[in-house]
């Protein structure tokens, strides 16, 4: 509503960023030090391709869940306050910030298109893939998921290949972040770690303002 109103007044709106990535699931044991001392560690990494990557929304002893975003299925996660309801896994997001330049001005639609692709490849759900399969460039299968050390907490996720979903720079950024985090919490880059995709964070348009938060219209 606000965007529509401001556009009618001829104001320039800004929103050229969207965050796209995966929900990572590993064991509580791997994340024990971070969970114990920080609960939710915040890590930021600059990938070799120039993207900014961050961790977000860590859930110790949590569960990966489906999020319905206007008909698009996305990955997300949560944890219960009651420890008796917890799982043996920790999940968190790895998100790659995509900042676009002119003439492109539809970042949210870009992320939606990538998310829909994952939905189509998983027949309406999201994809889960072992990190070891990502490194080998092959899709995960139900058999290989079951043989892994990490039991998926989201049973509706469909084994597949996130390499068919993400653009090259996005996937490379996610993998570089995973390897960097492995130095912080060894074992995270294990072949058994699970990646669910797509997770995305969308941003609203905002009016262009000066250093006093004024728009191009005097008094507004």
Protein language model features and the residues they cover:
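Residues forming the flavin
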Residues: 1-220
